[in-house]
Amino acid sequence: MDAPGDPEGPRPPGGDGPAGSARERLRRLSREQFYVLISAASVNLGSMMCYSILGPFFPKEAEKKGASNTIIGMIFGCYALFELLASLVFGNYVVHIGAKFMFVAGMFVSGGVTILFGILDQVPEGPIFIAMCFLVRVMDAISFAAAVTASSSILAKAFPNNVATVLGSLEIFSGLGLILGPPVGGFLYQSFGYELPFIFLGCVVLLMVPLNMCILPNYESDPGQHSFWKLITLPKVGLLVFVINSLSSCFGFLDPTLSLFVLEKFNLPAGYVGLVFLGLALSYAISSPLFGLLSDKMPHVRKWLLVFGNLITAGCYVLLGPVPILHIQSQLWLLVLILVVHGISAGMSIIPTFPEILSCAYENGFEEGLSTLGLVSGLFSAMWSVGAFIGPTLGGFLYEKIGFEWAAAIQGLWALISGLAMGLFYVLEHSRRRRRCKPQDILSTEEEKTALLPHEL
């Protein structure tokens, strides 16, 4: 089934087209495409609010219940580990299960377990509390993986020629979820206690379920012949996976560490700690649609966005503390400024990765359809989860051992290495293409001369 409103059928993203065609197609949205956007926006907003609500107050609450910083980091990190495993499964079987059913069921379970997280303060402290935190987070991770994998597949199917633009535009709602989650959670916690933030957000997500059941179109496709293994063993995809890992680990690193650092360093109340996260989320939400549009309109600039975005991110983490060897005094305004720059650099790096992987898959013989879109969506979600597991787990451990300043600098090394590796790959790829073009130019010149000789005689 071709994308609605696209008579030419799906084509690899980033293909040539008339100037302004991407913008024109987005103006001529069919009803189904409009409903897809609403559904994807709802899952982005709801899931990111549920994910980010923990930041301002949960680490402090967990400490009261007997959890160490390392355990708190693992509670954040286990979410990503099980999202990784679930994304690989759901991405491979999205055609068999059905994208719409996977989407709706994922949202329903996510809303329910968010409410369950709100009653964990009634659980006895110590091992029982820690075990229940892990159990509820794992259930939430699996449901979130189902909804997001299905959402990305449906979006790429509905908008085959504007993947980066649409994904980038919908990051507004992811950013809005990240923006609203911490301050809403912090102020509800400060005003009404531990339970209400989770119950409120869980109910909001559950209210979105019947809406999506009614409006989300049902896409069907035949199962494909390719596998995750073939996709991830492509050299370019392997490096893009490393980029995704590094960026998600940078975000995940901040979850268990930044709120504790701000509380200790600047003595802010829990409600205001959430506002510190605002700079990162707001700049990411605003910049992502712009980088998405740029990626679709000028596909050749994606490589530079990826490389420079990673290098800027590395610099941000060196200055986040800042690292002691720079002898720069830590100040709240500087921290917020660095988070704003990090949000922009993250948008530069994250948005081009999905269309780059999809283009690479098409170039290497993967069929165009929901099956390949499911593989790419599942791979993206799974590899994001790898970094999101390592980031908070390693971040919590390093924070405990060497402090936030050095831990952030070490985290920045990952982004630096991935940016340099991606840049080196693109340079080598460009030189290989130039060498390949030269013999073809020589052959075509000789053929032209041969064709002209009889006429000259």
List where the protein language model places each region.
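Extracytoplasmic gate region of multi-pass secondary transporters
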Residues: L54-P56, G238-F277
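Conserved MFS/SLC helix-loop-helix module at the cytosolic interface between two early adjacent transmembrane helices
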Residues: L85-P124
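Helix-to-loop junctions at the C-terminal end of transmembrane segments
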Residues: A86-G98, Y189, S288-H300
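Cytoplasmic helix-loop-helix junction between adjacent transmembrane helices
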Residues: F134-S174
